[in-house]
Amino acid sequence: MKAVTQEPPTGRPARPSLLAEVTRFVGALWRPGDVREVRIPKHDQWGHTASGYFDSPDTLAQAALEYDGKANIYLTLNPTDPALLARSVNRIKPRAENTTSDADILVRRFLFIDIDSVRCSGISATEQELAAAEDLMERLTHELADQGWPDPLTCLSGNGYYVLYPIDLANTPEAANLVGRVLAALAQRYDTAGATIDTTVANASRIIGLVGTMKMKGDATADRPHRRSRLLCVPDTFDPVSEALLEKLAGDRPPQSRPTSRSRSGRVRPLTDLLTDAGIDYREQPPDGSGITWY
């Protein structure tokens, strides 16, 4: 098991190094002309979502870090329509009215493999739980390399690991289906009792945790601390996975939802957890006369 550096809940790196880490991650995703959204769900006591659009990695990182340690910060993995910059030009609005939809994405640049440790919902991972996710990541990346896949960008997400393989796909229903089938095949092959691959992240407008910022689930405790996400490996070149390799892995497997929406006990995770993880803003209403809670 590799040692995983984590911060005490009360500390954080010096701001210059922190800014450099976030900028390095964003810069690894960026191409000239890109625009991306920063989104911060439920950042205040009223449950508002903050959002802003940026055409510069440096400006994005500086603005996003104002929320670091206050709420979980996310970024659209794929570039958005540049016209969306006019919603909030290189700044974050604390009460966003609109966020990015699948139709707003120009192209699919990355296959997002989100590896999470199996644990109860709403809490951070222990070192042992995190190690299970690391083992899955290492097995997956080594075996895909043996099959001719290029080197991915890898990150500690806080409670698991991100693996990002460059791809070059149009934003079409066919591409969404292919990505969904690839994730389903990977989950079928690599999921364990201690860690799973999230198969629900195939949509084009998927948001990803902003690497370099704190990831907070529940309260920080000695055995379940809040950890700062960080880059692990950035390849020297971003060679896209060919569509042929994607199809070979996907085979005829249909896209499917895996039990990542369930807790360790097998119970279905609360809808509020799923909405928050997806970065969807919501308001919970009191149960009506039939006992139904509306969102």
Predicted regions and their residues:
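Signature for HUH/AEP ssDNA processing cores
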Residues: 2-159, 166-185, 267, 271, ...
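Long, charge-rich alpha-helical interaction segments
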Residues: 222-268
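Short Gly/Ser/Thr- and Asp/Glu-enriched loop/turn motifs at secondary-structure junctions
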Residues: 108, 156-161, 202-207, 290
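N-terminal structured subdomain of primase-like DNA metabolism proteins
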Residues: 255-295
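Flexible helix-coil linker/hinge segments at domain or subdomain boundaries
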Residues: 184-221, 241
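Short acidic (Asp/Glu) and glycine-rich catalytic loops that position anionic groups and cofactors
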Residues: 39-46, 161, 223-227, 251-257, ...
